[in-house]
């Protein structure tokens, strides 16, 4: 786009489809890194934006039935927690930090990860699982959250989301 071109500004009062699309790649399975992608997806859907989430590598934990209810938050090596790094590896610290984060999130009325995924799918969001990650972890569709539309390759995801804004989390 050049300076002389008119910027595309969506008309949110128009009921017609905006043509906007966002693709969010969720690559982390920690509790604290699950929420940014889910919150952005929810916000995009609220604005009428076609929304696709692609779960890969550790982000697969967010959609794996056996793990999605038990995501953890570990402060080890995370200086943003403002905790003394010397105590973070001690037994119980991850459990305490996970409990505190879950409480803080719940106090704000934000749903837990499985309910958030359900909300996103209910609003028309699309969930995709990475074929390579599924194969590496010996997982099939039966192991995944029911709202996942399929296990696809990275190339297939790129094709499905052609022209989308892309976020890697």
Specify the residue positions occupied by each region the protein language model found.
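Short hydrophobic/aromatic patches at helix-to-coil boundaries
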Residues: 166-169
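Short internal beta-strands
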Residues: 51-57, 128-131
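Short, glycine-rich nucleotide/cofactor-binding loops
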Residues: 23-34, 63, 104-108
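Glycine-rich loop at the start of a catalytic domain that most often binds anionic cofactors/ligands
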Residues: 63-73
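Histidine-anchored nucleotide/phosphate-binding helix
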Residues: 35-48, 53
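A charged, amphipathic interaction segment
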Residues: 96-159
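Positively charged, low-complexity intrinsically disordered leader regions
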Residues: 2-14
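A glycine-rich helix N-cap at a beta->alpha junction
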Residues: 71-105, 109-112
